[in-house]
Amino acid sequence: MADAFTVALTLLSARELSETQLRARLTRRKLDPDDIDTAIARLKQDGTLDDRRVARALARMESSIKHRGRTRVIQKVRQAGIDADVADEAVSEVFEDVDEHALLERALERRLRGKAPRDLDDRNRARIVRGLMAQGFRLEAILKKLQ
């Protein structure tokens, strides 16, 4: 049976993982908990495992590629098992370079499908607002754009 360090390196070679994600995957493989702790400590020491780097990469992907708002990006980063302070710091760092209003504008245009906001009935307006809020945009910003 492979040791925890080798398995961890194999998993990390496929994609970046947070410490929590890596620990869960190693545990599912029924590896010795002490070996898992040792492997994770070694990976953290040599910089192979870095939750800050994972948080920044995940925040960049969620904001730039998936066009999510700040709230949803923070939620996604925290779901990866990253500490709340590290997640908030990474998202703030990424959103320094992101125009949230442009993100919202683009998401709204996709949802409107060429219609003007004033042409929406109440049902469709509510549907669009719920969808944009689920993407992590603030209600105040959404309502302002819909006026």
Q: For the regions a protein language model found, what residue spans apply to each?
A:
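An alpha-helical, amphipathic repeat domain used for nucleic-acid recognition
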Residues: 1-147
